[in-house]
């Protein structure tokens, strides 16, 4: 999915800003957070974040939930390069693995698991009786 932030700001400007941030804030990573297009979830009020390196993905999701005022019973999924990052992973680890060539980490959020990755599978209706040694 194309980033609106990338569309609005030329590569050189984004790269210079990320480099300036990295030099000035050694304990933070620059993150762009945008809603997945056509998602039924509220729009976030700001896209640019300086996230502490020791924050987990789960803690960052909490920040997003608060900013969009999402009730606790509503689901939210975040994606980095079309994958669901583990909630226990540090943002700094995700940043090192998935940062864009401009120096920003691009995070998308949605109310649906848009990219089709299975989180859990209901196996209650499956029949395993024909598998040898199945307990």
From Swiss-Prot:
Name listed for the protein in its UniProt record: Autophagy-related protein 8
Source organism (scientific name): Candida albicans (strain SC5314 / ATCC MYA-2876) (Yeast)
Taxonomic classification: Eukaryota, Fungi, Dikarya, Ascomycota, Saccharomycotina
Keywords attached to this entry: Autophagy, Cytoplasmic vesicle, Lipoprotein, Membrane, Protein transport, Transport, Ubl conjugation pathway, Vacuole
PANTHER family (UniProt xref): MICROTUBULE-ASSOCIATED PROTEINS 1A/1B LIGHT CHAIN 3-RELATED
Pfam family for this entry, one: ATG8
PTM annotation: The C-terminal 19 residues are removed to expose Gly-116 at the C-terminus. The C-terminal Gly is then amidated with phosphatidylethanolamine by an activating system similar to that for ubiquitin.
UniProt GO cellular component terms: autophagosome membrane; cytoplasmic vesicle; fungal-type vacuole membrane
UniProt GO MF annotations: phosphatidylethanolamine binding
Induction, per UniProt: Induced during biofilm formation.
Lipidation (Phosphatidylethanolamine amidated glycine): 116
Propeptide boundaries: 117-135
UniProt cross-references to SUPFAM superfamilies, sorted A to Z: Ubiquitin-like
Site positions per UniProt: Cleavage: 116-117
């Amino acid at each position: 999915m194309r980033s609106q932030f990338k569309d609005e700001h030329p590569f050189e400007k984004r790269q210079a800003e990320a480099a300036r941030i990295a030099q000035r804030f050694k304990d933070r990573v620059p993150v762009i957070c945008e809603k997945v297009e056509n998602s039924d979830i509220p729009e976030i009020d700001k896209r640019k974040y300086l996230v502490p390196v020791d924050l987990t993905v789960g803690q960052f999701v909490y920040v997003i939930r608060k900013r969009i005022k999402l009730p606790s019973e509503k689901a939210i999924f975040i994606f980095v390069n079309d994958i669901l990052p583990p909630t226990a992973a540090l943002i700094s680890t995700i940043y090192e693995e998935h940062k864009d060539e401009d120096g920003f980490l691009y995070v998308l959020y949605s109310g649906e698991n848009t990219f089709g990755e299975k989180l859990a599978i209901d196996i209650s209706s499956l029949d395993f009786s024909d598998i040898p040694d199945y307990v």
